[in-house]
Amino acid sequence: MQDFFGSVRRSLVFRPSSDDDNQENQPPFPGVLADKITSCIRKSKIFIKPSFSPPPPANTVDMAPPISWRKGQLIGRGAFGTVYMGMNLDSGELLAVKQVLIAANFASKEKTQAHIQELEEEVKLLKNLSHPNIVRYLGTVREDDTLNILLEFVPGGSISSLLEKFGPFPESVVRTYTRQLLLGLEYLHNHAIMHRDIKGANILVDNKGCIKLADFGASKQVAELATMTGAKSMKGTPYWMAPEVILQTGHSFSADIWSVGCTVIEMVTGKAPWSQQYKEVAAIFFIGTTKSHPPIPDTLSSDAKDFLLKCLQEVPNLRPTASELLKHPFVMGKHKESASTDLGSVLNNLSTPLPLQINNTKSTPDSTCDDVGDMCNFGSLNYSLVDPVKSIQNKNLWQQNDNGGDEDDMCLIDDENFLTFDGEMSSTLEKDCHLKKSCDDISDMSIALKSKFDESPGNGEKESTMSMECDQPSYSEDDDELTESKIKAFLDEKAADLKKLQTPLYEEFYNSLITFSPSCMESNLSNSKREDTARGFLKLPPKSRSPSRGPLGGSPSRATDATSCSKSPGSGGSRELNINNGGDEASQDGVSARVTDWRGLVVDTKQELSQCVALSEIEKKWKEELDQELERKRQEIMRQAGLGSSPRDRGMSRQREKSRFASPGK
């Protein structure tokens, strides 16, 4: 109240009016004073309710009409329900439909409605996201007992399914997948969204090696979940959970970074972290009490180990962000450049006599070729004097630029080779022809050396051993290449199977387009016209006449001959009649004109279907004629050979002979 009276007192400013100038000594009237107090209070806006800003306009996506879709075959099962293949009947786009039961698994109606509302709010949040490494959400459709979540369809399988089929991934594949995973996670974090359930089962891979983060079953906006101590809910899988998530002490984006490290260990070992030592409940207690990270495999490179140690920091604030991890040497592949530098220093020392270099090779028989592409074969010495570091800098393997790289580049992997580092390096080195002369000299030296070895009979066995060591790649290289080729073959096979599943949906979509086309609508206006069309095509007489009777009057054959079908026999009821009659001819011309105006996909589809039917009819007719011709040829050959009639006739005559001998009295 004191503030109220103080504001009123400060707002009261009495100014003399023109009448007051004439009557300076007269006090103001009580009514005038009350009016001034009222106006001052009104101007001070004390009793006015605060005006809230109008709510933001609804998103245009939400105002869009519901998607008309049709369910296909079952393609998987998720944490909340089953996943089916579907098709958008308006655009023909393939969908992945996740069906969540909303009636049978809940104790009360309130919990059911709360769960439905949570999922619908989640989809509304995620519909606005668009990134090459993120699964796109399209909307929700509620039914009586299910809630259908419409998602982008990704051909292929998840990382966990690939691990079950092929085993652990080589480090090159892990690097490629990790980079794309970080790109998608960086996009989510920039939009204030935590995934909170990153694992191999929630990462989808298409047949081109492009991965997409999926199953945002536990994601929320941080602004909606955060409290004074951070988010307080625990969702996810225990093996991939960060310690602060298990302890429920509040977590942020750094919990996703911990899950990224656990996913990398999963791809390297083929197993979930901690799964070999503890069950799920025991893993929760162990991670929550010790706060230690999963064991790191010893087979990894130093850069990969350093990457995992940074992701699996015990203190959440010490973990780097997704943007910082994208600049790590393991993700960028800088260890390849360092190895190439060592290779260049070795190749630049070829000024020493070549036999000494070969003696060094023979003295270390256990040395194997690194995956960078060491040039053990003499035939590859043509490129030995080119600087590998410069060539790799000119054409970076991972398509990384100074601005952080383009996210779309990671999806443009070669169709024929899953990872083509060696091919790119060789092609780049081959383009540098300014040192070709010196390279040819070294090649001549290698040929001379080979002839020298051929002259000495005692060195034949050593030469064959050395060539086997240099020509054949190491076991690790063969194993990695075999695994990569198996993964690509599996993804291609998966895409082919899914293409077979989508064929019935496409056929139904095209049939629906043909059904609602203008030409079919015109043909459905009159049933008599369809009957006349059928009689005209089959050359049948009218219903009122018998086929054996002649025409009673007029010439009905005139109308029959004038009838022509614009489609092949297999095109159904969409045929047009051109009967030589005045009124009918005018109406048919109008119909044909309107049909001619129809352009687009429907006409093309009808033409393709009619052509296919016509070709099938021609092929069937040719096959029948070919069978008849072959039968005639066979009979002629048998008659020329003296075999007489056909085998069927001989069988019948043989039966007659048996019956005659069986009954000699007849």
From Swiss-Prot:
Q: Which residues form the Protein kinase domain?
A: 69-331
CDD domains xrefs: STKc_MAPKKK
Catalytic reactions on record: L-seryl-[protein] + ATP = O-phospho-L-seryl-[protein] + ADP + H(+); L-threonyl-[protein] + ATP = O-phospho-L-threonyl-[protein] + ADP + H(+)
- Recorded coiled-coil stretches: 101-131, 620-643
Gene Ontology MF, one: protein serine/threonine kinase activity
Q: Where is the active site?
A: 197 (proton acceptor)
GO BP terms: namely: protein autophosphorylation; response to oxidative stress
- E.C. number, please? 2.7.11.25
Give tissue specificity per the record.
Answer: Expressed in roots, inflorescence stems, flower buds and flowers. Low amount in rosette and cauline leaves.
Residue stretches spanning the membrane = none
Which SMART domains does the UniProt record give?
S_TKc
Organism superkingdom: Eukaryota
Q: List, as start-end ranges, the regions of compositional bias called Polar residues.
A: 560-569
> Which keywords does the record carry?
ATP-binding, Coiled coil, Isopeptide bond, Kinase, Nucleotide-binding, Serine/threonine-protein kinase, Transferase, Ubl conjugation
| Ranges where the record places region Disordered | 452-481, 536-592, 635-666
Point out the cross-link Glycyl lysine isopeptide (Lys-Gly) (interchain with G-Cter in ubiquitin) in this chain. 109, 111
Q: Where does ATP bind?
A: 75-83, 98
What InterPro entries does its record include?
Kinase-like_dom_sf, MAP_kinase_kinase_kinase, Prot_kinase_dom, Protein_kinase_ATP_BS, Ser/Thr_kinase_AS
Q: Where is the composition biased (Low complexity)?
A: 538-558
Spell out the PROSITE patterns in the cross-references: PROTEIN_KINASE_ATP (PS00107), PROTEIN_KINASE_DOM (PS50011), PROTEIN_KINASE_ST (PS00108)
Please share what else the UniProt entry notes about this protein.
The protein kinase activity of isoform 1S is higher than that of isoform 1L.
Q: Which family does it belong to?
A: Belongs to the protein kinase superfamily. STE Ser/Thr protein kinase family. MAP kinase kinase kinase subfamily.
What's the protein called, per UniProt? Mitogen-activated protein kinase kinase kinase ANP1
Q: Per UniProt, what is the name of the gene that codes for the protein in this document?
A: ANP1
